[in-house]
């Protein structure tokens, strides 16, 4: 049986705006239940919404970042459904005229680079949050603090073919929204949520069949996304062999994912567009977006995005795939690296130092690069001192930790503690001769092929100089002298 997976993702991103989408209530996470509500987000009679301008500008920026076509006319619609946490009985959303459409982004997986097309990006408001208590009376509570929070929904085309590609796509989207400072994109607090639509395209005897679509909701981690996709792929293959049900005969079902069992569970048959009874929202007028306004947002708020940054960093500095992926995980880390690289002749060495020593300190202190007070130029200078032999690689790590603790440059510590490495050839040669004269047995062992004899003599050289001589140069001079003995 020949088949391919058809996977489309619906991603909801809660924007980090100061206020909600259609009222002036604060848009914060958590807090006392129902403490950030008003007649508008509670849907009380007579309360009229107004559009948050930042919601529109954020959608435009997201459209630019995803290479989308941006509409000049903004229309809002009412999407009707009866959930307890939807106080108005409808959600303000966009139906047939999303603000952005026909976009794309690139992802990178083990198979290489791939383009994923984006069908649409539309604006909408969030619902409240239901809290179910497993007590004797089985009570449920509703917190409306989240009701009306500003959302963007990004809907991909079914171009994704595996769980690996799905996770890569989600990572790419999350990086874009974080780079643009539009959202924290945290699955833990619900500001980044994903639904998976998945079915199979099966070819039998040159005839194509599509299996019923499963929409898997409430996936709370990238790991769950991959596991759910892998399970559905296996399940749909088995069901096709047993029942041969097609998309035309069954349609679409809404599924949940049981993390503990690793299986998808049927929740309900999926509503169709007509079930939502979309109508244009009569309380919100059409908004005309001038072309200059759309372009102005791009010119003033657009930044270099991660995919482009990785290509540039590799071409400009010769960094590895691992280096650029790690550096571009945070746009501020990229900035820190490039500032440090300005003061060193070896940018790759600077990158290695940041990705090992600097990130180690950040992880230990549980802080981000913005909270790291040591100027980037100090890192570049430290690396340069190692390269030119001013200090040894071993002592450099001790110097770095003191730099971090005291927030001073490496040269300050080197001068204070007289740590500068000795690279004077004549001085080192005199020490080597001393060690050779004092250790004739080690010379004999070396002649017999015992490599540990060289290590012993190098140790003696370092002991005599308190570890301050250049070890590479010392080893070179020692080996030359041993050849002459």
Curated annotation (Swiss-Prot):
Catalytic activity, reaction form: L-glutamyl-tRNA(Gln) + L-glutamine + ATP + H2O = L-glutaminyl-tRNA(Gln) + L-glutamate + ADP + phosphate + H(+); L-aspartyl-tRNA(Asn) + L-glutamine + ATP + H2O = L-asparaginyl-tRNA(Asn) + L-glutamate + ADP + phosphate + 2 H(+)
Keyword set, alphabetical order: ATP-binding, Ligase, Nucleotide-binding, Protein biosynthesis
Top-rank taxon, per record: Bacteria
Catalytic class of the enzyme: ligase
A GO term, aspect molecular function: glutaminyl-tRNA synthase (glutamine-hydrolyzing) activity
GO biological process: glutaminyl-tRNAGln biosynthesis via transamidation; translation
SMART domains: GatB_Yqey
Stored InterPro entries: Asn/Gln-tRNA_amidoTrfase_suB/E (IPR017959), Asn/Gln-tRNA_Trfase_suB/E_cat (IPR006075), Asn/Gln_amidotransferase (IPR018027), Asn/Gln_tRNA_amidoTrase-B-like (IPR003789), GatB (IPR004413), GatB_Yqey_C_2 (IPR023168), Gln-tRNA_amidoTrfase_suB_CS (IPR017958), Gln_synth/guanido_kin_cat_dom (IPR014746)
SUPFAM superfamilies given in the database record: GatB/YqeY motif, Glutamine synthetase/guanido kinase
Pfam families named among the record's database cross-references: GatB_N (PF02934), GatB_Yqey (PF02637)
Record EC number: 6.3.5.-
Keyword Nucleotide-binding: yes
Disulfide bond sites: none
Subunit field text: Heterotrimer of A, B and C subunits.
Function: Allows the formation of correctly charged Asn-tRNA(Asn) or Gln-tRNA(Gln) through the transamidation of misacylated Asp-tRNA(Asn) or Glu-tRNA(Gln) in organisms which lack either or both of asparaginyl-tRNA or glutaminyl-tRNA synthetases. The reaction takes place in the presence of glutamine and ATP through an activated phospho-Asp-tRNA(Asn) or phospho-Glu-tRNA(Gln).
NCBIfam families, per database record: gatB (TIGR00133), PRK05477.1-2 (NF004012), PRK05477.1-4 (NF004014)
Similarity-based family: Belongs to the GatB/GatE family. GatB subfamily.
Xref: HAMAP family: GatB
Protein name (Swiss-Prot/TrEMBL): Aspartyl/glutamyl-tRNA(Asn/Gln) amidotransferase subunit B
Gene: gatB
């Amino acid at each position: 049986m020949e088949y391919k997976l058809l996977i489309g993702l619906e991603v909801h991103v809660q924007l980090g705006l100061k206020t909600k989408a259609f009222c002036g209530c604060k848009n914060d996470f958590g807090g006392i239940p129902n403490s950030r509500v008003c007649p508008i987000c509670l849907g009380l009679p007579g309360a009229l919404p107004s559009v948050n301008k930042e919601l529109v500008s954020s959608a435009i920026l997201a459209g630019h970042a995803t290479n989308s076509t941006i509409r000049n006319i903004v229309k809002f619609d009412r999407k009707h459904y009866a959930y307890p946490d939807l106080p108005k009985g409808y959600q303000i959303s966009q139906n047939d005229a999303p603000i952005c459409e026909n976009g794309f982004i690139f992802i990178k997986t083990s198979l290489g680079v791939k383009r994923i097309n984006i069908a649409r990006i539309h604006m909408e408001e969030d619902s409240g949050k239901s809290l179910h208590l497993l007590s004797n009376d089985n009570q449920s509570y509703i917190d409306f603090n989240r009701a009306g929070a500003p959302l963007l929904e990004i809907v991909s085309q079914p171009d994704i073919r595996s769980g690996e590609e799905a996770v890569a796509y989600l990572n790419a989207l999350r990086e874009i929204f974080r780079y643009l400072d539009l959202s924290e994109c945290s699955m833990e607090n619900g500001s980044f949520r994903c639904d998976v639509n998945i079915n199979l395209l099966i070819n039998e005897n040159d005839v194509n069949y599509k299996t019923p679509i499963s929409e898997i909701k409430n996936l709370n981690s990238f790991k769950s996304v991959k596991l759910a996709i892998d399970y559905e792929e296996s399940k749909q293959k088995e069901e096709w062999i047993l029942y041969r049900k097609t998309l035309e005969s069954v349609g679409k079902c809404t599924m949940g994912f049981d993390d503990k069992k690793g299986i998808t569970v049927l929740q309900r048959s999926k509503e169709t567009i007509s079930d939502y009874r979309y109508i244009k929202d009569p309380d919100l007028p059409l908004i005309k977006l001038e072309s200059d306004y759309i372009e102005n947002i791009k010119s003033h708020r657009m930044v270099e995005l991660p995919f482009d940054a990785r290509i540039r960093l590799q071409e400009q500095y010769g960094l590895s795939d691992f280096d650029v992926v790690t550096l571009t995980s945070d746009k501020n880390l990229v900035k820190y690296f490039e500032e440090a690289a300005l003061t060193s002749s070896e940018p790759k060495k600077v990158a290695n130092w940041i990705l090992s020593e600097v990130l180690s300190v950040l992880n230990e202190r549980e802080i981000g690069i913005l909270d790291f007070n040591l100027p980037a130029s100090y890192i570049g200078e430290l690396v340069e001192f190692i390269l030119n032999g001013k200090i040894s690689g071993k002592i450099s790590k001790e110097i770095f930790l003191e730099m971090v603790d005291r927030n001073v440059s490496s040269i300050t510590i080197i001068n204070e503690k007289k740590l500068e490495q000795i690279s004077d050839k004549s001085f080192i040669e005199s020490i080597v001769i001393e060690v050779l004269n004092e250790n004739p047995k080690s010379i004999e062992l070396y002649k017999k092929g015992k490599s540990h004899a060289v290590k012993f003599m190098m140790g003696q050289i370092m002991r005599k100089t308190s570890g301050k001589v250049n070890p590479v140069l010392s080893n070179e001079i020692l080996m030359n002298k041993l050849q002459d003995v």
